[in-house]
Amino acid sequence: MFQSRFTILIRTLNSSKSRHFSSTIEPTKPQFPQTLAGLRARLAAESPSLSEFSDLQSNNSYSVEVGTKKKPLPKPKWMREAIPGGDKYVQIKKKLRELKLHTVCEEAKCPNLGECWSGGETGTATATIMILGDTCTRGCRFCNVKTSRTPPPPDPDEPANVAEAIASWGLDYVVITSVDRDDLPDQGSNHFAQTVQKLKALKPHMLIEALVPDFRGDPGCVENVAKSGLDVFAHNIETVEDLQSVIRDHRANFKQSLDVLMMAKDHAPKGTLTKTSIMLGCGETPEQVVKTMEKVRAAGVDVMTFGQYMRPSKRHMPVSEYVTPEAFEQYRTXXLVSYVLFSLLISV
């Protein structure tokens, strides 16, 4: 049933000129400088147009089932990740232990950890540093980070320590994220801004992405981070609009998340990218995914990424289905958002 519905959806998109969107940046040569302009050029060059959005072949399906408790099915072969390793991976892990820093890569048991830390196919080593502690004030059904209504207070020296640590590594791109801190008056936004500013002072050319919580939709908090000097302002909507209340904490919602992204676009310096992500395999339908993409596009978001949800433990929300690589590719080529990236593996 999913196969036929997905194919019909693709044909509808192909025939609808009103939904044709493409990047406004011309493709460039394969080699791009490690700058924000280079990042924008690379994204534009790698993002196909709607004309490349073709039907799935008859022997492909949207997803495969995950089985039941009584009759579990093994992971598909494309979901089996390699064991982490490599010089950069070892170096980053050693430094994290020495400095007692937290990463969402480890806290959330992200299956992409090895590829990101080692540099992957591009050789660009990335890491996602988690600030404001390792305890979240919210409890989303998919997330492995521990929770508490009253987490320990933030370390006032953390922005400087994190900046100095990251500056000493051989990273080209760093993502700074955090747990939700509903217990703090500023939701932790000033901590974010200080960390970005101190890191930029030490490494002006390093690309910095701030993956922030929703700050309860507070415009002042969003503005503070958006004007901190970052290159990419990211906030994840996590899932399609129709599944928000099922998957996310009750204090989060789709409209509030889109509002945060739009406010960031208004306040950030011209050229700053905005980005969001959703998980697939949570029970969503292809129609719901496309509808969500359209609303993300209407909100002016530059980059949207997709990932297969992977259950971090038996206590968490089960995987509904494993979405096939072919289906991921069809979403990527839909061009409903300026730049669409995808990964088969994601944990949060």
UniProtKB/Swiss-Prot annotation:
Q: Does the keyword Mitochondrion apply?
A: yes
EC class of the enzyme, as a word: transferase
**Matching InterPro entries, A to Z?**
Aldolase_TIM, Elp3/MiaA/NifB-like_rSAM, LIAS_N, Lipoyl_synth, rSAM
Question: Residues in domain Radical SAM core?
Answer: 121-341
Q: Give the protein's cofactors.
A: [4Fe-4S] cluster
One cellular component (GO) term of this entry? mitochondrion
Which residues participate in [4Fe-4S] cluster 1 binding? C105, C110, C116
Which keywords fit this entry according to its UniProt record? 4Fe-4S, Iron, Iron-sulfur, Metal-binding, Mitochondrion, S-adenosyl-L-methionine, Transferase, Transit peptide
Example of a GO biological process term: lipoate biosynthetic process
Its EC number(s):
2.8.1.8
Q: Where in the cell is it found?
A: Mitochondrion
Keyword Signal appears in the UniProt entry: no
In this chain, [4Fe-4S] cluster 2 is annotated as bound at: C136, C140, C143
> What note does UniProt attach to the cofactor annotation?
Binds 2 [4Fe-4S] clusters per subunit. One cluster is coordinated with 3 cysteines and an exchangeable S-adenosyl-L-methionine.
Q: Which Pfam families match?
A: LIAS_N, Radical_SAM
Entry's Gene Ontology molecular function annotations: 4 iron, 4 sulfur cluster binding; lipoate synthase activity; metal ion binding
Q: What is catalyzed by this enzyme?
A: [[Fe-S] cluster scaffold protein carrying a second [4Fe-4S](2+) cluster] + N(6)-octanoyl-L-lysyl-[protein] + 2 oxidized [2Fe-2S]-[ferredoxin] + 2 S-adenosyl-L-methionine + 4 H(+) = [[Fe-S] cluster scaffold protein] + N(6)-[(R)-dihydrolipoyl]-L-lysyl-[protein] + 4 Fe(3+) + 2 hydrogen sulfide + 2 5'-deoxyadenosine + 2 L-methionine + 2 reduced [2Fe-2S]-[ferredoxin]
Please give the family membership noted in the entry: Belongs to the radical SAM superfamily. Lipoyl synthase family.
Q: Which HAMAP family match?
A: Lipoyl_synth (MF_00206)
Q: This protein is called what? A: Lipoyl synthase, mitochondrial
The organism of origin for this protein: Ricinus communis
Q: Which gene is annotated as encoding this protein in its UniProt record?
A: LIP1
